[in-house]
C-alpha cells in the first residue's frame, strides 16, 4: 500500500519503475541468446569493461552512455581479435581483456574528484534515475527489441547450429559481433538500474529460469522478459519499503524465481526429475 501511494505521489518512483521494468524486459530478450550461445562470461566481461568509459565520461562531464558504449564495443572487438589472432582460447581472451579494462576503470576512478555517482554506476541506484536516462533506456530497449525481431531467424539458426548457418550463407561472424553490440547497449542501459557489478545477473538469471521451463526460443524470450520485469517490480518494492540497494534487491528476487523453477519446473525441475526416477 505504501509503495502504491509512493507511485502516485513521487515522480522519481514512477521513473524508477518504468526504467526497471524496461531493463528487465530487454535484458530477458538479449539474455536468452546469450544463454543459448553459452556466452554468459562474455556478458560479464562487457559489463565490467564499460567501467573506464563511465569514468572518462564522468570526468569530462559527458553522458556516461557514450563512454560506456564505446568501451563495451572495444572490449568485444578486442576479445574477438585476441581469440582469432593467437592460440588463446575464447574464455582466456575474455578474462585478459575484461580484467585489463576493469583495472583501467578503477585507476581512472581514483582520479575522479567525487566517487558518489560512480558508486551508483557500480552498484545501481534506480531511485535517482533522471528523466533523460529513463528515455534513453526506453529508446535503447525499443531499438534492441526491434533489431532482434528483424534478425530473429538469423540469430535463431546461428545460435543453435553455426555450421548450418554458414551453409545457408549467413555471415556468422557478423551476427556474433552484432549480438555483442546489442549486448553492450543493453548493458549500458542497465547501469543505473542494477549497476556494473550486478548487470550480468539480470542478463543471465531470468533467461536461465526461462530455459528450464521451455525448449522453444520464442517462448523462452517471452518468459525471460516476464521474469525480468517481475524481478524488477518486486525488487524495487523491497528497495523502496525497506531502504535496500535497488539492484541487489532485483537480483535476489530473480535468483529466488530461478531456484523455484530449478526445483519445480515440470520437465527440468529437480524434484520432478527425482520423482520420475523413483517411478521408473
Swiss-Prot record:
One of its GO terms (cellular component) is ATP-binding cassette (ABC) transporter complex. The chain crosses the membrane at residues 16-36, 41-61, 62-82, 92-112, 137-157, 168-188, 193-213, 221-241, 244-264. It is a multi-pass membrane protein. The keyword Nucleotide-binding does not apply. SUPFAM superfamilies: ABC transporter involved in vitamin B12 uptake, BtuC (SSF81345). One of its GO terms (biological process) is response to zinc ion. It is found in: Cell membrane. Keywords: Cell membrane, Ion transport, Membrane, Transmembrane, Transmembrane helix, Transport. Pfam families: ABC-3. Its main location: membrane. InterPro entries: ABC_BtuC-like, ABC_TroCD. Belongs to the ABC-3 integral membrane protein family. This protein is probably a component of a manganese permease, a binding protein-dependent, ATP-driven transport system. This is Manganese transport system membrane protein MntC. It comes from Listeria monocytogenes serovar 1/2a (strain ATCC BAA-679 / EGD-e). The gene is mntC.
Amino acid at each position: 500500500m505504501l509503495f502504491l501511494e509512493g507511485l502516485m505521489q513521487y515522480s522519481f518512483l514512477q521513473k524508477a519503475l518504468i526504467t526497471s521494468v524496461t531493463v528487465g524486459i530487454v535484458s530477458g530478450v538479449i539474455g536468452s541468446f546469450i544463454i543459448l550461445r553459452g556466452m554468459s562470461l562474455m556478458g560479464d566481461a562487457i559489463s565490467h569493461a564499460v567501467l573506464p568509459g563511465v569514468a572518462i565520461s564522468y570526468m569530462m562531464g559527458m553522458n556516461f552512455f557514450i563512454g560506456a558504449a564505446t568501451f563495451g564495443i572495444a572490449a568485444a572487438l578486442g576479445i574477438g581479435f585476441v581469440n582469432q589472432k593467437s592460440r588463446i582460447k575464447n574464455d582466456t581472451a575474455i578474462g585478459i581483456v575484461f580484467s585489463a579494462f576493469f583495472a583501467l576503470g578503477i585507476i581512472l576512478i581514483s582520479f575522479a574528484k567525487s566517487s558518489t555517482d560512480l558508486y551508483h554506476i557500480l552498484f545501481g541506484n534506480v531511485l535517482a534515475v533522471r528523466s533523460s536516462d529513463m528515455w534513453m533506456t526506453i529508446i535503447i530497449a525499443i531499438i534492441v527489441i526491434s533489431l532482434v525481431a528483424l534478425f530473429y531467424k538469423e540469430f535463431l539458426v546461428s545460435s543453435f547450429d553455426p555450421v548450418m548457418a554458414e551453409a545457408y550463407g549467413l555471415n556468422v561472424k557478423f551476427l556474433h559481433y552484432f549480438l555483442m553490440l546489442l549486448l553492450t547497449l543493453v548493458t549500458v542501459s542497465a547501469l543505473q538500474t542494477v549497476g556494473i557489478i550486478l548487470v550480468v545477473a539480470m542478463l543471465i538469471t531470468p533467461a536461465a529460469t526461462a530455459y528450464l521451463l521451455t525448449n522453444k526460443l520464442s517462448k523462452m524470450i517471452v518468459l525471460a522478459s516476464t521474469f525480468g520485469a517481475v524481478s524488477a517490480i518486486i525488487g524495487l518494492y523491497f528497495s523502496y519499503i525497506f531502504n535496500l540497494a535497488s539492484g541487489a534487491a532485483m537480483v535476489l528476487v530473480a535468483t529466488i524465481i530461478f531456484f523455484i523453477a530449478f526445483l519445480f519446473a515440470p520437465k527440468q525441475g529437480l524434484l520432478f526429475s527425482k520423482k520420475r526416477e523413483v517411478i521408473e
